[in-house]
Amino acid sequence: GVFLDALKKFAKGGMNAVLNPK
């Protein structure tokens, strides 16, 4: 659903922030 997709997107963004800190 929309909520699950948003959650996945948030998790992916969080991982990117950890792996590639600006």
Swiss-Prot record:
Disulfide bonds: none annotated. This is Antimicrobial peptide 4. Keywords: Amphibian defense peptide, Antibiotic, Antimicrobial, Cytolysis, Fungicide, Hemolysis, Secreted. GO terms for cellular component: extracellular region. It comes from Xenopus tropicalis (Western clawed frog). It is found in: Secreted. Has very strong antimicrobial activity against Gram-positive bacterium S.aureus and yeast C.albicans, and very weak activity against Gram-negative bacterium E.coli. Has strong hemolytic activity against human red blood cells. It comes from the Eukaryota. GO terms for biological process: defense response to fungus; defense response to Gram-negative bacterium; defense response to Gram-positive bacterium; hemolysis in another organism. Expressed by the skin glands.
